[in-house]
């Protein structure tokens, strides 16, 4: 199967479109969390991969997840996932949908990875720079440590990665020297 994020993107976008068009009872984050949790169950996976089961039975299983949305539309969405054999991508669909919801609400999730833990002053400086970079959005800052970076930072949000690490600079130099 193709990369799950690539497979999941159009389904997450469809959910966002549905959310934007619906006046009320819109799909929310909770619906996209419950479904992957159900699919993670070994028995559910066995049921969904059973070639003897009809698509309607599989949709019936997945639609047992309680939702506060238009049930007919939700079942149609689930039927599409089943028919196209995209149900394994539900976790990624949920993640992408939640990301899109946060963006629509003006929130940008940023993961900042450094070689050593940032002190309070460094965190403040990075947070300020990110808020300037993503003006008009609330920046939700998460931090990780990866000693393999040697020094510097790697900033990741959505499709954007800024690699200002020593490791990244060394790798770039190596690529330049090879070409």
Curated annotation (Swiss-Prot):
InterPro entries: ATP_synth_OSCP/delta_N_sf, ATPase_OSCP/d_CS, ATPase_OSCP/dsu
Pfam families attached to this UniProt entry: OSCP (PF00213)
One GO cellular component term: proton-transporting ATP synthase complex
GO molecular function: proton-transporting ATP synthase activity, rotational mechanism
UniProt cross-references to Gene3D superfamilies, sorted A to Z: N-terminal domain of the delta subunit of the F1F0-ATP synthase
Subcellular localization, as worded in the UniProt entry: Cell inner membrane
UniProt entry keywords in alphabetical sequence: ATP synthesis, Cell inner membrane, Cell membrane, CF(1), Hydrogen ion transport, Ion transport, Membrane, Transport
Entry superkingdom: Bacteria
Signal peptide location: none
Topological relation to the membrane, as annotated: Peripheral membrane protein
Protein family membership: Belongs to the ATPase delta chain family.
Family annotation (PANTHER family): ATP SYNTHASE DELTA CHAIN
Self-association state and partner proteins as the record states: F-type ATPases have 2 components, F(1) - the catalytic core - and F(0) - the membrane proton channel. F(1) has five subunits: alpha(3), beta(3), gamma(1), delta(1), epsilon(1). F(0) has three main subunits: a(1), b(2) and c(10-14). The alpha and beta chains form an alternating ring which encloses part of the gamma chain. F(1) is attached to F(0) by a central stalk formed by the gamma and epsilon chains, while a peripheral stalk is formed by the delta and b chains.
Function: F(1)F(0) ATP synthase produces ATP from ADP in the presence of a proton or sodium gradient. F-type ATPases consist of two structural domains, F(1) containing the extramembraneous catalytic core and F(0) containing the membrane proton channel, linked together by a central stalk and a peripheral stalk. During catalysis, ATP synthesis in the catalytic domain of F(1) is coupled via a rotary mechanism of the central stalk subunits to proton translocation. This protein is part of the stalk that links CF(0) to CF(1). It either transmits conformational changes from CF(0) to CF(1) or is implicated in proton conduction.
Name assigned to this protein: ATP synthase subunit delta
